[in-house]
Amino acid sequence: MTIDGTGQSKEALQDERLNTGSDKVYQNYMMPALELYDAKVSINHWQLRDCIKPGSMNQSKLYYIYDHSIRVLDTDSSVLRSPVRRHNSIQPSNSGKNSTEKTSTKGSRTTGSYISKNLHVPSEKLVEFNFKPRCFTELNGLTVCGGLIGSDDKGFPSNWNRLAQDANISLPPPSQPINISKNISFPINSHYSNPNIWKGIVEFYNQETDTMMTFTLGQFINNCVTLYDRASMQFDLFACNNDGHLYQCDVSNRDVTLVKRYADLKFPLNNASLSHDGQTMVVSGDSNKFAVYNQNELTNQFSLHYDNHPSWGSSVNRVRRIPRFALPDESEYIENIYEAPNSDHGFYNSFSENDLQFATVFQNGTCAIYDIRNMATPMAEISSTRPHSHNGAFRVCRFSYGLDDLLFISEHQGRVHVVDTRNYVNHQVIVIPDKVNMEYINERKHNTNHNFTTNNNNENESNDSKNELQGADYRSLSRRRFSLPSMPNVTTEPWITMAQRIPKKYLEPQILPFPKVMDKISNESVLFSTKGSSSSDVAHPYKRRCSFRVRRVSTSAPTADYSNNNVNASLGTPAADSIATSSSNSAPQNLIDPLILSHQQASNDVFEDDEYYEAYNDVHSTYRVSSDYHGVSARAFESFLRPPSTPDLPSDDDNFAANSRNNRGTSNFLRRPVITTQESNEFSEENNISGIDWVEDRNGSSLIIGTDYGIMRWNINSWARRSFSSYDLC
């Protein structure tokens, strides 16, 4: 039988293009939409970036660090996510202005009131400590923070005395020495033997009793605190200190007591991770070595002196033959201190759900995954996109649970890795958009107003300025375009980011295959190379989605205006989202110029048959000129802000939106990144990753990412992850 390959169907040809060669499709592990909460997360130590954690009793509640306090954000809102899953909320269309009006009228009835009413989730302050938390954890209502006594803390002796003098009262000491068990002995004539000069801090807060306690623990900073509940209201606390010691404390309703001091590793310790059953603990620090401890159930303490534990999956115990009359060699005992290849300083460890595998990450951009049953060599190694660099250093890693089978790893800035743990080969990278440098913008804010008015006297001057942009004056002119309207609650609510002032499409992250991001130093180079490669490849209508929708959620306190809007919305008055449903040329007053972030714009690289996303692009394909620049026409505004290589913009935004559907190449120039110059590097910088975590609640499993713009909650495509499709050729 002869098979004619020329008569293949259209679907077969498309499948062949998408699954072979450079057009291979990578499955999107994340859902097409995510929420961005404008909650500011503080990084109180530049290397410790595990500042966000889900609640142990309610994972929808996110605990995060802000300055001296711990704040709580409740992300459990079924009404908040319901409009996203209704695909008929925004109708696709194929016409121009009429389609936009249709979307505006229908969208206002279906989604306008819901969106404006529900995209507001205020955050709350849980507790404020006397010392800045550098790390923290929460378990069953007990919150513990670690740090040190710093000069910028309220509890610093001089600052504390000043507070007492200003209040004209006698304040109790901000901290007290921790109780030490009699079984602990310290080296004589050592600075560790005098707890009175310890500078490490551990702070406790009990939500049930609303009590707070602060103790000094360790000679230097405590880089990590870990809790394990042994019984009701009885915990084991493990604190990693820069003095090279791991401290184990007994926490109960009576007191906090130091019961054990581990000094096996002779370098500063950064992280201690416990398995879910509490039997195994991995400790790493400023070295490429890490220790794997095993718990003695009789003493409730950990030790490195053990051999082969039957509960780790091996039923055969190792037997050593010792010659008769020979003394046993103590050096033959397994110390369980391992050296990871191609690594330097360890910063985080994480166990999988079954406790059989764990991942440990290092500062040079290496992640080693080990099987606890065979520690000879790592079973897999994950590399950073920027190894041996500051912004590419690995900081935090997390395993997902259930059937998701994913490993998340955060870099120091800008990127989060998503690795398929079924084979450790499928590897994608989430690229977070760069942030605006507010300090740079504020320095030049006073040069903005008079420059806008002088550049719009007549059309001749507009054309002259367009020609001047070609020369050396473009750099000086470009400095005048950076201005941000003032945020109304910036002084009263400093825990709010500027995410509400940035257009949504410039907050959209991208997911790219690891080979496309490897060795790209900046995110601008990643996006620019992606656009260049996509234009050179053979175009086909089915492309993998790499840009994702962002739904901004305000975390500010409710105001009178917000309350009135809620009343109107509840009475049936439509309060439509001006960005999603309006067809006018004016935008909200709090938008900045999108072109200052044009290098961050994601490409329109999505499935053409995705009607929901197509309708979204039709509405958001053009930016709106802000009406708060009085006396400036849209044409002059656009020509002034346009880089010299950018073609003229159409004067009618709605016509441009209609043309963009018929000619994708015309609309993509707004989505192409501008080549980086020294000037652009001054007003934009990479987003700091303040933490990642995995949560699962009634809304599904989600990835939590902390950025400078706020906290992202991104649902995982769990239905797609439940497919174990494979085939063999016989």
UniProtKB/Swiss-Prot annotation:
Residues 89-98 have a biased composition (Polar residues). InterPro entries: DUF2415, Quino_amine_DH_bsu, WD40/YVTN_repeat-like_dom_sf. The modification Phosphoserine is found at S82, S89, S483, S651. Residues 82-114, 447-468 are annotated as: Disordered. It comes from the Eukaryota. The keyword DNA repair does not apply. Residues 449-460 have a biased composition (Low complexity). Disulfide bonds: none annotated. The keyword Phosphoprotein applies. Pfam families: DUF2415 (PF10313). Keywords: Phosphoprotein. This is Uncharacterized protein YLR149C. It comes from Saccharomyces cerevisiae (strain ATCC 204508 / S288c).
